[in-house]
């Protein structure tokens, strides 16, 4: 079996005819059903690729095929390859027509004319398969994730949505049968003149916008198949618990962690220092103080940090970025926490109040230092003379005395 060689023009635009393989009647009769199916798939995918690249071979000034312009209509009786098919109805142009006409002959494979039952693949939306190929196709999904990549999305022949009356391969209103597996049919629009969402080809191929929205999160998707895949990842159950602040969660452990914000409950205890936390994640981060773990490294100076947000703030030292600017005085800051404290200079706000004497402070660290006046706590001890101090600044000042003596 010899196929005609591909012809590539030296100059000019490549047309669909240039990349298509043509068969004579004798050669076509020698092809098996599997070979004809393969020929059909390859030809349709080539057509999709040519159209997506703008290499459409239609009439001059004619736009590339849109989601309402490409369809293949097939009469009930079997035609011979390369037979004359009306170019106005059966194919986009006279050059593609004879080639696409060959594809119509695949319609009689595996008992299509016997109106055998077709099956829908749940993972691939409305794509239809006969009984034998359906089971073979289902095996392809075993051990793989159902999401399909963008390259596959671009294959027009694999993504056209069909509207079928029942599960028969014959469209009941016209009495004409269609090549369901080709993926290039428009049935309902042919009879009603209207375009149904189920007959629209994927908007990604045609450069359209996302028309399918998720009712749960309002995200938009280019195809209904992708939307279906997204919806499978959403929680299938209603939120089991609601908080007084309006937040909800379908997971009880997440809700319990959130509740700790309101109840001040701290059920997680550090086994080393006894400090309490309202969530397990906060406890794990705290334990890095005891273990010395610093998993976040600066690529510029190789410094390590316990928290990711500390690394992000540190990197602004290298970039010079100061994203937080005071609208009152024009000062800018690298840290949001420093900026918040600075704003209190202008507002006079002092939210931290001492319960012993009623004195207020703008920073929590200032209140902590002040409390030591009442408690008598002196946590900073000198390693040379064992003197203790309430503030670390006082300790550093004292240590200079020992350095001078050592000189």
UniProtKB/Swiss-Prot annotation:
Linked residues for Glycyl lysine isopeptide (Lys-Gly) (interchain with G-Cter in SUMO2): 176, 198, 251, 266, 308
Keyword Transcription included in the entry's annotation: yes
InterPro entries: KRAB, KRAB_dom_sf, Znf_C2H2_sf, Znf_C2H2_type
A single GO BP: regulation of transcription by RNA polymerase II
SMART domains (alphabetical): KRAB, ZnF_C2H2
KRAB domain mapped to chain residues: 14-90
ZnF C2H2-type: positions: 91-113, 119-141, 212-234, 244-262, 268-290, 296-318, 324-346, 352-374, 380-402
GO CC aspect terms: nucleus
Keywords: DNA-binding, Isopeptide bond, Metal-binding, Nucleus, Repeat, Transcription, Transcription regulation, Ubl conjugation, Zinc, Zinc-finger
One term of GO molecular function: DNA-binding transcription factor activity, RNA polymerase II-specific
Family: Belongs to the krueppel C2H2-type zinc-finger protein family.
Protein task: May be involved in transcriptional regulation.
Protein's UniProt name: Zinc finger protein 552
Organism, as annotated: Homo sapiens
Lineage: Eukaryota, Metazoa, Chordata, Craniata, Vertebrata
Gene (name only): ZNF552
């Amino acid at each position: 079996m010899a196929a005609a060689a591909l012809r590539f023009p030296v100059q000019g635009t490549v047309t669909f005819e240039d990349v298509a393989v043509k068969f004579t009647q004798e050669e076509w009769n020698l092809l098996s059903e599997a070979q004809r199916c393969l020929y059909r798939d390859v030809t349709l995918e080539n057509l999709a690729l040519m159209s997506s690249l703008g290499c459409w071979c239609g009439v001059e000034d004619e736009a590339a095929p849109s989601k309402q312009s490409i369809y293949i209509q097939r009469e009930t009786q079997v035609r011979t390859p390369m037979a004359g098919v009306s170019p106005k109805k059966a194919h986009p142009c006279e050059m593609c027509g004879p080639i696409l006409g060959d594809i119509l002959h695949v319609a009689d494979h595996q008992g299509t004319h016997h109106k055998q039952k077709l099956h829908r693949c749940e993972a691939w939306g409305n794509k239809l398969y006969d009984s034998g190929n359906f089971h073979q196709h289902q095996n392809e999904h075993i051990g793989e994730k159902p999401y399909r990549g963008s390259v596959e999305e671009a294959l027009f022949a694999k993504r056209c949505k069909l509207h079928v009356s029942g599960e028969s391969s014959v469209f009941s209103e016209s009495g004409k049968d269609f090549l369901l597996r080709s993926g290039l049919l428009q049935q309902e629009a042919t009879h009603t003149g209207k375009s149904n969402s189920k007959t629209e080809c994927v908007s990604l191929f045609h450069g359209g916008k996302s028309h399918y929205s998720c009712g749960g999160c309002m995200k938009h998707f280019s195809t209904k198949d992708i939307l279906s895949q997204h919806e499978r990842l959403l929680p299938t159950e209603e939120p089991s618990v609601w908080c007084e602040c309006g937040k909800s969660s379908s997971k009880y452990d997440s809700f319990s962690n959130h509740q700790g914000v309101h109840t001040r409950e701290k059920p997680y205890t550090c086994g080393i220092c006894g400090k309490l936390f309202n969530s397990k994640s906060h406890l794990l981060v705290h334990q890095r103080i005891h273990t010395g773990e610093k998993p976040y490294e600066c690529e510029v100076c190789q410094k390590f940090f316990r928290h990711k947000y500390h690394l992000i703030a540190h990197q602004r030292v290298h970039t010079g970025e100061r994203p937080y600017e005071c609208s009152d005085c024009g000062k800018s800051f690298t840290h949001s926490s420093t900026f918040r404290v600075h704003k209190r200079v202008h507002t006079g706000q002092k939210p931290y109040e001492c319960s012993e004497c009623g004195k207020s402070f703008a920073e929590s660290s200032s209140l902590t230092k002040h409390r030591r006046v009442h408690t008598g706590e002196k946590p900073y001890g000198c390693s040379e003379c064992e003197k203790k101090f309430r503030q670390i600044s006082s300790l550093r000042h004292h240590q200079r005395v020992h350095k001078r003596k050592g000189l």
